[in-house]
Amino acid sequence: GDGPGDHARAASTFLTGSHPYKTHGAEIEAGVSVDQVLAKRLGETTRFSSLEIGCERGAQAGNCDSGYSCAYSANISWNTPTTPLAKEINPQLLFERLFSAGTKGEILEGRRKRQGYRRSVLDLISEDARVLQKRLGSKDQSKLDEYYTGVRELEKRLMLSSREIKTLPGVEKPPHDPEDFGEHMRLMADLMVLAFQGDLTRVATFMVGNAGRNR
C-alpha cells in the first residue's frame, strides 16, 4: 500500500477498479470508470451519454486526504484515467439541462419568463404533446400522463426549494450548502429517475457526499 488516504483511495477505486496514483498535484491518474465504459456502448442513441450528479461539489485540486488529491475524493466517474467528470449538484440546473434547450443565457432567461408567468416547461410543448397523445394507445397515454405529471410536480418542488434557500433578496445560498439536505438528495434522485424514464440517458452516477464526509 501507500499509507493513509483510505477515503480518497476508496472513492476513486469504486467504479474504476484501479489503484489511484498518490498525489495532490496535477498528475492525477486512476482508471476509466465502468459507467463511462457503458456510456460509450449505450449512450449513442440518447440525448446524454451519461449523467454525473451529486449533492456536494468538492475541490478538484489540493490535498484532501493524506496526500491524495481532492479530485479522488470528489469524483467517482472518470472519462479517462486522468480526467474525472465533475458532478452537477444544483437540482434547478440539472432540471433545465434535461428539459430545456439553448445556451446557458437562453435557458436562464426562459426560466425567468416561465416563473414570471407561472408556466411550466411542459407548456412550451403542449401542442406537440396533444398530437403525440392521439397517436398512442391507452396504456401508452397513461404512461405519458404519468411522466408529464412527474415533471410538473418536480418543477413545483424545485421552485419551492429555490425560494426557501434564499438568504437575501436576489441572493441564493451556495448550491453545495442546501437548506434541507434530505430534500436536495430526493430532488436529485427524482431527476435521475425522470431522465431514465424519458430515455434521456441510460447511464448515471449519483455521489451523495464526497469521500471522508459525515453525510
Region locations from a protein language model:
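Ligand-binding pockets and gating/stacking loops
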Residues: 1-215
